[in-house]
């Protein structure tokens, strides 16, 4: 078995996933590019999409293979991991990037669309981590990078399904970072902002120019490497900038027994001093977009 580290990237055929795969290869990893080639809404498929990125890596002198299995199923996630183990005999890092969009207001959203988005973003990440876990433990320097979003951290109108899945990944990071610590695993998440097919309809053109996926991937390459010492972090990243996101609590206050007293306490707690509060992901991204818009 080679000493070369092996990284598996889901959603690796386009946008951020492709950029991550190229960055991991540039760092020296063998890369398993996993992507069904589906459309933005998760329908259809093109097995050649993943192979095109793997071929691009090989043409540049790297080592890569492709898999077009659907990691939003137990069997597909296991098959993707098995592909890595069969070809390389090891798996050291998982970058869970696969995702789809089916945006609608919650009142109008079919539950099938809710389920589909949660399955691809949250369940697929968990399925892949579960399938890869024994190999990541065996590595001794196993690394997992999940892909969260400001939409989950702060909320975004019309994205109840997407936001629920992305915040679910934060919970998964919190637990897996604890459970993997003794085995040397490091589990982190990024909340990226980049010009991709998901964001191009949503962000102003001036900002998109400063939000290349390649400005996110160096962070992912580090988090997936043996050099990464941190675990349990959620890092918002884009436009060449990065910030840590944390859940904070106010001071504890006495909870009265009467309705009026409870209402007053809740109103008081709604305005917590310290930190930078955001009412939505749009507000949270505003400072980053302002920087990106000024980039040449």
Where are these regions (language model features)?
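C-terminal helical subdomain
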Residues: 189, 207-294
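The beta1-alpha1 cofactor-binding region of Rossmann-like NAD(H)/NADP(H)-dependent oxidoreductases
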Residues: 47, 51, 68-79, 111
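Canonical Rossmann dinucleotide-binding motif of NAD(H)/NADP(H)-dependent dehydrogenases/reductases
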Residues: 2-33
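Residue(s) in the substrate-gating loop at a strand-loop-helix junction
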Residues: 149
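Active-site helix of classical SDR
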Residues: 129, 165
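A glycine-rich helix->loop->beta "capping" turn
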Residues: 3, 60-63, 83-96, 102, ...
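Substrate-binding pocket helix/loop in short-chain dehydrogenase/reductase
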Residues: 57, 105-106, 113-115
């Amino acid at each position: 078995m080679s000493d070369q580290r092996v990284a598996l990237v889901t959603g690796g055929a386009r946008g951020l996933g492709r950029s991550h795969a190229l960055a991991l290869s540039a760092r020296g990893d063998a890369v398993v590019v996993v992507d069904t080639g589906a459309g933005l809404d998760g329908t259809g498929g093109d097995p050649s999409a993943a192979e095109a990125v793997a071929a691009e890596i090989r043409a540049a002198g790297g080592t890569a293979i492709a898999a077009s299995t659907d990691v939003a199923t137990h069997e597909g996630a296991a098959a993707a991991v098995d592909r890595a183990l069969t070809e390389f005999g090891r798996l050291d890092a998982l970058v869970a990037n696969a995702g789809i969009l089916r945006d609608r207001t919650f009142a109008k959203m079919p539950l099938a669309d809710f389920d589909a988005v949660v399955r691809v973003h949250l369940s697929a990440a968990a399925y892949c981590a579960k399938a890869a876990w024994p190999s990541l433990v065996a590595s001794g320097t196993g690394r997992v990078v999940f892909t969260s979003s400001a939409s989950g951290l702060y909320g975004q109108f019309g994205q109840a399904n997407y936001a629920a899945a992305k915040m679910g990944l934060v919970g998964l990071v919190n637990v897996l970072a604890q459970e993997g610590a003794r085995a040397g695993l490091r589990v982190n998440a990024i909340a990226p902002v980049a010009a991709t097919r998901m964001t191009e309809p949503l962000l102003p053109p001036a900002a998109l120019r400063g939000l290349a996926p390649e400005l996110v991937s160096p962070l992912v390459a580090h988090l997936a490497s043996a050099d990464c010492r941190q675990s349990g972090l959620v890092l918002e990243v884009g436009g060449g900038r990065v910030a840590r996101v944390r859940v904070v609590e106010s001071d504890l206050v006495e909870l009265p027994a009467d309705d009026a007293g409870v209402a007053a306490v809740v109103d008081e707690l709604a305005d917590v001093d310290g930190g930078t509060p955001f009412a939505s992901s749009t507000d949270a991204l505003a400072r980053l977009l302002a920087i990106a818009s000024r980039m040449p």
